[in-house]
């Protein structure tokens, strides 16, 4: 039985009592032996950085609200938690704190688990795991060896973003303005051996599958469609000659605009293209240029903004229609990793080619015109001024200056050229994708070892399954200059499993997106001997996944791909891992700073600032509490360490209680929108919690009575109608709309109406009892600790409220 004091609302006492009850009864531990419909709800698993931030709190509270609501509506609910524990931050912390990454990681997990428990989340902790343990990563090692045997995992040299400080490969998204996202070092291009998974084999299925994901935001699906980037075009062959006229290997280029072929005035190739390397052997100036371009970006986004640079190679390409020779140029906006590393340059109808041609004085030819120009600007064509219609394929176009193809539109030209090239063996129709195979190698220590052995005789050999896991040594001295396993001969040196000769282990580790690509399935059967067992097909696909939209094209793409690999390995039956996706907005807060001596800014935490606001709550002045002197107001931005505007959830829970923090995080904004942290708003939620506490205790002190609907007065009927209208709205807000802020507002309105209802008669008290019981249950998904206590105060006994049915609308009551 609860030991909560009857009158004063003490959040710490209330929350400790509820949490002890949940722990003692294993309230949220679930299994598959239920006749209830299943509901699998989870948030993206956290990285154990050392402390929760408000973004975590918002994310996990959303999941918890839905999970508790679903259990109250008769579902068998799984809400698990684990730790995405490998990764570069642990290595950096190990260097800074002079400790092993493993020790730092496990200590952080202990601390963050306690923080999560203090917030009262309805988590099945029996399924917890950390992805850095051999019990977890042995399964992805086994899967990788199977993918190797099927040809879905392979090794090749690849041009990568190389961070010379962190000594690792960076994804394109980790390169910001040409520098490493973490170290700030100038990124280089390097060609090194890398392991890849053939995600491109699944490109069309990944694209088609988006049409079935009705529960995913359109914005995420659009981002994935664009990232996959399906395009239909022609692959065309250009013969190549050197400076002596001798034939070299031909170039094959892919284009979605074959209608502009007669406008080709040069061909552009990537700096890493074999023809560029060949030409550089006899051209020192070109060789120097290629070396310079190593520091350029390798992402399309970077190439759109950086200055166009290039150099003629001295080679020429033969136009496949006219037979004319056009120069071959190296250009910094052509990527070796996209298509063939060569593009046909049509400066009259491609803006990048246009800018490049104007810079270097190359010919520009118009070969397409609009059939129905809308104005003089569209009638004119100027080789010195770019106009968007030059490349607008959506308009009615007509070929000009294109020999026998003059007068054709886009589709007519496409078909005519495709037929010609296929007949002559000079090209073919082709579907191309922007999506590249997933490079999974990382030159780091703190990651899952790639289970491969290199033998001089046998080559790359997968580690036999009976020798898995390949365990990463955890008790290491880590200085940050390279990886400890690379310099440890006892770990690195081994014998070849095929010939028994001397061999060496792969010292690269997996990209940490590998671990987060299948963990959702592992929660369903965390103690299975294989990757998953039959329980996966009970729970999968997950019903709701909550996380940030910033993961749309990396984690969520790999996540879908890996699930299909598991399906094809007959580990799961479903095609997709998640049915519904909720992408919550950021948590933002005000920023304050003083100018630093070095010309920068010293950011000051809002907790250290005295803020003056106008009558509308806007900041009009601010001063540092420590010295009373003014500070600059920096605007409202995402909570971050760099802006020092984060709020410590632990401090907020200690000051206000977990329920109040949960309540504010759900009330301040709809889930998909940014939430502005405002402690005045938190204080307002605390006042509401105290008012509700007093409201219930005052009512109980007056005594209860049985409800007799037939004898209710008009005022009593009005309160009862308000109660049942609120039940209907909150039920819809929780279940269909995920609009938690309006659900809270509706309960507050009912509370206010009840506060004005001072009928102390027996039926007045009965109507009030029904309303208060409904309010306690309606708030339970958001404020479960207080609801747990107030349910007892209302005389209903100590029980798990998630097993109490969610209130139902009484049609007669709603229309009373």
From Swiss-Prot:
One of its GO terms (biological process) is leucyl-tRNA aminoacylation. Its EC number is 6.1.1.4. GO terms for cellular component: cytosol. A motif ('KMSKS' region) lies at residues 638-642. It is an enzyme of class 6 (ligase). Pfam families: Anticodon_1, tRNA-synt_1, tRNA-synt_1_2, tRNA-synt_1g. InterPro entries: aa-tRNA-synth_I_CS, aa-tRNA-synth_Ia, Leu-tRNA-ligase, Leu_tRNA-synth_edit, M/V/L/I-tRNA-synth_anticd-bd, Methionyl/Leucyl_tRNA_Synth, Rossmann-like_a/b/a_fold, tRNAsynth_Ia_anticodon-bd. It catalyses: tRNA(Leu) + L-leucine + ATP = L-leucyl-tRNA(Leu) + AMP + diphosphate. The keyword Hydrolase does not apply. One of its GO terms (molecular function) is aminoacyl-tRNA deacylase activity. It is found in: Cytoplasm. The keyword Ribosomal protein does not apply. ATP binds at residue 641. A motif ('HIGH' region) lies at residues 46-56. PROSITE patterns: AA_TRNA_LIGASE_I. Keywords: Aminoacyl-tRNA synthetase, ATP-binding, Cytoplasm, Ligase, Nucleotide-binding, Protein biosynthesis. It comes from the Bacteria. Belongs to the class-I aminoacyl-tRNA synthetase family. PANTHER family: LEUCINE--TRNA LIGASE, MITOCHONDRIAL, LEUCYL-TRNA SYNTHETASE. This is Leucine--tRNA ligase. It comes from Xanthomonas campestris pv. campestris (strain ATCC 33913 / DSM 3586 / NCPPB 528 / LMG 568 / P 25).
């Amino acid at each position: 039985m609860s030991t909560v004091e009857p009158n004063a609302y003490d959040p710490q006492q209330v929350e400790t009592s509820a949490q002890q009850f949940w722990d003692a009864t294993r309230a949220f531990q679930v299994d598959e032996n239920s006749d209830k419909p299943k509901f699998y709800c989870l948030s993206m698993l956290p990285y154990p950085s050392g402390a929760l931030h408000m973004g975590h709190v918002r994310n996990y509270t959303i999941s918890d609200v839905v999970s508790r609501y679903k259990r109250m509506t008769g579902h068998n609910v799984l809400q698990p938690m684990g730790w995405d524990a490998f990764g570069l931050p642990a290595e950096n912390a190990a260097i800074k704190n002079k400790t092993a990454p493993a020790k730092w990681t496990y200590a952080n997990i202990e601390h963050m688990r306690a923080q999560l428990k203090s917030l009262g989340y309805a988590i099945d902790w029996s399924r917890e795991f950390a992805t850095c343990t051999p019990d977890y990563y042995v399964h992805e090692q086994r899967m990788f060896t199977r993918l190797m045997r099927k040809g879905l995992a392979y090794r090749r040299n690849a041009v990568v973003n190389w961070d010379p400080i962190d000594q690792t490969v960076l994804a394109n998204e980790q390169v910001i303005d040409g520098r490493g996202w973490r170290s700030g070092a100038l990124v280089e291009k390097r060609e090194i051996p890398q392991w890849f998974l053939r995600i491109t084999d699944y490109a069309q299925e990944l694209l088609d599958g988006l049409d079935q994901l009705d529960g995913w935001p359109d914005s995420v699906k659009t981002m994935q469609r664009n990232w996959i980037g399906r395009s239909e075009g022609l692959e065309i062959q250009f013969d190549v000659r050197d400076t002596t006229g001798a034939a070299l290997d031909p170039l094959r280029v892919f284009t979605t605009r074959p209608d502009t072929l007669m406008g080709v005035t040069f061909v552009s190739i990537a700096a890493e293209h074999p023809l560029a390397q060949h030409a550089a052997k006899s051209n020192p100036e070109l060789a120097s240029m290629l070396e310079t371009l190593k520091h350029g970006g390798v992402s399309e986004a970077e190439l759109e903004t950086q200055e166009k640079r290039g150099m003629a190679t001295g080679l020429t390409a033969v136009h496949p229609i006219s037979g004319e020779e056009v120069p071959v140029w190296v250009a910094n906006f052509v990527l070796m990793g996209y298509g063939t590393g060569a593009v046909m340059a049509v400066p009259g109808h491609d803006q990048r080619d246009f800018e490049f041609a104007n810079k270097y004085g190359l010919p520009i030819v118009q070969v397409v015109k609009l059939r129905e120009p809308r104005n003089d600007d569209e009638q004119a064509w100027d080789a010195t001024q770019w106009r968007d219609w030059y490349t607008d394929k959506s308009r009615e176009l007509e070929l000009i200056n294109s020999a026998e193809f003059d007068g054709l539109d886009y589709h007519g030209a496409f078909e005519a050229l495709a037929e010609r090239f296929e007949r002559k063996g000079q090209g073919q129709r082709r579907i191309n994708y922007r999506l590249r195979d997933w490079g999974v190698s990382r030159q780091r220590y703190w990651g899952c070892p790639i289970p491969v052995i290199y033998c001089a005789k046998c080559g790359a050999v997968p580690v036999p399954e009976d020798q898995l896991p390949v365990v990463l040594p955890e008790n290491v001295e880590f200085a940050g200059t390279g990886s400890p396993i690379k310099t440890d001969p006892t770990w690195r040196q081994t014998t070849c499993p095929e010939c028994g000769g001397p061999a060496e282990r792969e010292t690269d580790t997996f990209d940490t997106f590998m671990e987060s690509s299948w963990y959702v399935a592992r929660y369903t059967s965390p103690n299975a001997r294989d990757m998953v067992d039959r329980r996966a097909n009970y729970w999968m696909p997950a019903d709701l996944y909550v996380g940030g939209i910033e993961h749309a094209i990396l984690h969520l793409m790999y996540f879908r791909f890996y699930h299909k690999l598991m399906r094809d390995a007959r580990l799961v039956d479903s095609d997709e891992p998640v049915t519904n996706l909720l992408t919550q907005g950021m948590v933002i807060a005000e920023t304050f700073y003083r100018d630093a001596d070095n010309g920068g800014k010293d950011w000051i935490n809002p907790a250290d600032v005295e803020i003056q606001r106008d009558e509308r709550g806007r900041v009009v002045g601010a001063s540092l509490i420590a010295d009373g002197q003014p500070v600059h107001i920096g605007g409202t931005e995402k909570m971050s360490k760099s802006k020092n505007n984060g709020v410590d959830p632990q401090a907020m829970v200690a000051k206000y209680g977990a329920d109040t923090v949960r309540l504010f995080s759900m009330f301040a904004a709809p889930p998909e929108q940014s939430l502005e942290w405002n402690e005045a708003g938190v204080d307002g939620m605390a006042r509401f919690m105290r008012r509700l506490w007093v409201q219930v205790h005052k009512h109980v002190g007056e005594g209860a009575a049985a409800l007799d609907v037939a004898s209710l007065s008009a005022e009593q009927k009005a309160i009862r109608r308000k109660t049942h209208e609120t039940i209907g709205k909150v039920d819809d807000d929780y279940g269909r709309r995920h609009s938690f802020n309006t659900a809270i507002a509706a309960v507050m309105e009912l509370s206010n109406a009840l506060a004005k209802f001072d009928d102390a008669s027996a039926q007045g008290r009965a109507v009030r009892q029904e309303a208060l019981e409904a309010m306690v249950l309606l708030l339970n998904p958001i404020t479960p600790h207080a609801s747990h206590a107030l349910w007892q105060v209302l005389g209903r006994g100590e029980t798990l409220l998630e097993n109490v049915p969610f209130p139902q609308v009484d049609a007669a009551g709603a229309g009373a």
